[in-house]
């Protein structure tokens, strides 16, 4: 029958998928780094599903253990659960930030609600929490050292903050809220990324006045990449946007670029995020109140060094007054220059970078464009390596390993005695599937399995000015 043929084909496809999914096998790569040359978007959802099933079994084993709850059979067992889920999640989240595509976005929309529900199933489980609480209540009499005691307190606090003390009706509402909150960042981030990628400012040769040769070169290569001949293109990515705002003499074009950046996902945009922001605020506030906090800010800061929103505002206010006074002084200096160029004009946000650079040149004889050749990315990276070696004795050796994008470079990190410390990925340049900003993350966290140290695999991700055919990547003092 046709249904039998379908079942046989489906079964074959599933077996093939299992056989080909890199997350279902040990990674035979240098130091066990992710096999990016084999990982594909369709691998993640099955990997998440298997990883969640494995952790569910690990949690069930803790719950069904008939021995008296102890640090080893409850706290340590819980802490060691979910390693596969962590591994898949670290790789997935990194790729969704640094090299996303439509297939990954679709996988993320499917995975996030499943992961949120899985997390709630664990953190709101009464049997598991009762065992954790039993150890927590007896922590002072179990002969634990300071590290073990801290782990008990952290895990107990994590469950309480997640809603373990709520009644069944409250827990059900919390699950609904968490499910909705799981999808909102995905939708919000996708909109920002698409709005950023959709905008291009096309320039003619008459609109290049003031732009250094390196900035023109990047704009020219971007235009060629987009198939635009005899043109120059500026995008909303920081390495393209900020140099244009800094050097372009075309005030109307600076305004156009600045407003395009600020108005992303705003009213009238195809990717309007305003309703999502309202949903964020409403759901977070309801969650905080459900958990016994007066606001979401109070909920977040309660687990941080600040402790309360009031402490955060106290610090901000200490900085705000002198910072505002200094900003007004700088604006007055820049406005004086603006009046020379455009008498009667009002100083606008898109004037800030341009006139700040003019003030630096006029007052301090500092010119970023002149200084940049001294800060090629290669020189800065080698300088950082040299400093790390002088301070800590560690060295960095190029490593041939799979990468998720051709722009990435990989290094093995060695201790002073030559032993392996970890692997470091660099991903320096902007591209259409990459979030803005800079961050450090891990593909594998450092941990210990018994006495064996599992070395970390770390990535440093930036959005520096990319090289052109004629010039290397040049950084600024900032």
What are these regions (language model features)?
Residues 1-6:
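Short, small-residue-biased leader/transition segments that mark boundaries at the very start
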Residues 17-212, 217-219:
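N-terminal helix-rich structural modules
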Residues 465-478:
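Short pre-active-site segment immediately N-terminal to the catalytic Zn-binding motif
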């Amino acid at each position: 029958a046709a249904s039998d043929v379908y079942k046989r084909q489906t079964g074959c496809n599933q077996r093939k998928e299992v056989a080909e999914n890199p997350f279902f096998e040990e990674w035979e790569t240098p130091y066990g780094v992710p096999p990016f040359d084999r990982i594909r978007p369709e691998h993640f959802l099955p990997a998440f599903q298997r990883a969640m099933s494995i952790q569910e079994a690990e949690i069930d084993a803790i719950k069904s253990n008939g021995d008296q709850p102890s640090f080893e059979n409850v706290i340590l067992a819980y802490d060691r659960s979910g390693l596969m889920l962590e591994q898949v999640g670290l790789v997935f989240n990194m790729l969704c930030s640094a090299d996303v595509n439509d297939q990954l976005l679709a996988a993320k929309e499917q995975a996030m609600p499943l992961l949120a529900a899985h997390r709630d199933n664990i953190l709101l489980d009464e049997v598991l929490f009762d065992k954790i609480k039993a150890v927590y209540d007896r922590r002072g009499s179990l002969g634990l050292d300071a590290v073990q005691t801290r782990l008990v307190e952290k895990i107990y606090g994590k469950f309480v903050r997640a809603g373990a003390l709520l009644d069944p009706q409250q827990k059900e509402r919390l699950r609904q809220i968490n499910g909705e909150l799981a999808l909102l960042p995905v939708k919000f981030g996708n909109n920002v990324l698409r709005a950023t990628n959709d905008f291009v400012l096309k320039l003619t040769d008459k609109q290049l006045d003031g732009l250094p040769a390196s900035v023109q070169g990047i704009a020219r290569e971007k235009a060629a990449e987009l198939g635009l001949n005899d043109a120059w293109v500026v995008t909303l990515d920081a390495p393209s946007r900020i140099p244009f705002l800094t050097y372009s003499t075309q005030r109307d074009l600076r305004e156009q670029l600045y407003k395009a950046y600020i108005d992303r996902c705003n009213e009238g945009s195809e990717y309007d995020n305003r309703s999502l922001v309202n949903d964020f605020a409403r759901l977070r506030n309801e969650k905080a109140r459900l958990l016994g906090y007066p606001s979401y800010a109070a909920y977040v800061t309660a687990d941080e060094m600040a402790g309360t929103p009031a402490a955060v505002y106290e610090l901000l206010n200490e900085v705000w007054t002198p910072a505002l006074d200094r900003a007004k002084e700088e604006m007055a200096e820049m406005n004086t220059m603006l009046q020379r160029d455009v008498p009667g004009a009002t100083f606008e946000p898109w004037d800030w970078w341009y006139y700040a650079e003019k003030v630096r040149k006029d007052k301090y004889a500092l010119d970023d464009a002149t200084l940049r050749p001294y800060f090629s990315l290669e020189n800065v990276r080698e300088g950082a390596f040299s400093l790390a070696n002088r301070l800590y004795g560690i060295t960095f050796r190029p490593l041939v390993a799979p990468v998720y994008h051709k722009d990435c470079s990989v290094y093995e990190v060695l201790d002073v005695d030559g032993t392996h410390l970890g692997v470091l990925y660099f991903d320096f340049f902007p591209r259409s599937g990459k979030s803005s900003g800079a961050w450090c993350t891990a593909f594998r966290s450092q941990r210990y399995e018994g006495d064996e140290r599992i070395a970390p695999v770390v990535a440093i991700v930036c959005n520096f000015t990319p090289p052109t055919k004629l010039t290397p990547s040049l950084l600024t003092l900032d």
